[in-house]
Amino acid sequence: MNSLAIRVSKVLRSSSISPLAISAERGSKSWFSTGPIDEGVEEDFEENVTERPELQPHGVDPRKGWGFRGVHRAIICGKVGQAPLQKILRNGRTVTIFTVGTGGMFDQRLVGATNQPKPAQWHRIAVHNEVLGSYAVQKLAKNSSVYVEGDIETRVYNDSISSEVKSIPEICVRRDGKIRMIKYGESISKISFDELKEGLI
């Protein structure tokens, strides 16, 4: 920085008790000061300027504890097991619940395990977005292929029969989640660019 800017910032930061007269005259091309030059002003200015702390990159480290937010996103492609049904909660909001099965692929790690599919994994999907919930009820049926993107959450509730506290892991689709029905047998030439753009956004 030039010395004039440093001195002006020093004047602005100094108290009104010690008046400092700096007169500035404008020349043909530049500004210059007719006041005395203080060599310590530049050092004082650099000491008073607060430096911004450098941003630390976040890594996946479980030792960081509660301060680390982590990533808890799930992307599921599979077949619908239980058809979507809507429930009305006590607060008046509507939640759409259905299950999606994934798996059934062949396990190549076992010797002699030809044509032995792995058991399917079932995932409970809870759609808290009303628009996506109505889409799921209208479009999805049992055995239809679906793409689901949402957050992994654990719902804790009290069992009314045994009075035990139970927890259920589920994939919650909220405002930033996605649900798309996957259609087989369609030619790529029949799909418009708007539909492709909608699926990517």
From Swiss-Prot:
Residues 71-184 form the SSB domain. Its main location: mitochondrion. One of its GO terms (biological process) is DNA replication. The keyword Cytoplasm does not apply. Signal peptide: none annotated. PROSITE patterns: SSB. GO terms for molecular function: mRNA binding; single-stranded DNA binding. Gene3D superfamilies: Nucleic acid-binding proteins. GO terms for cellular component: mitochondrion. The keyword Transit peptide applies. Keywords: DNA-binding, Mitochondrion, Transit peptide. It is found in: Mitochondrion. Binds to ss-DNA. PANTHER family: SINGLE-STRANDED DNA-BINDING PROTEIN (PTHR10302), SINGLE-STRANDED DNA-BINDING PROTEIN, MITOCHONDRIAL (PTHR10302:SF13). This is Single-stranded DNA-binding protein, mitochondrial. The lineage of its organism: Eukaryota, Viridiplantae, Streptophyta, Embryophyta, Tracheophyta.
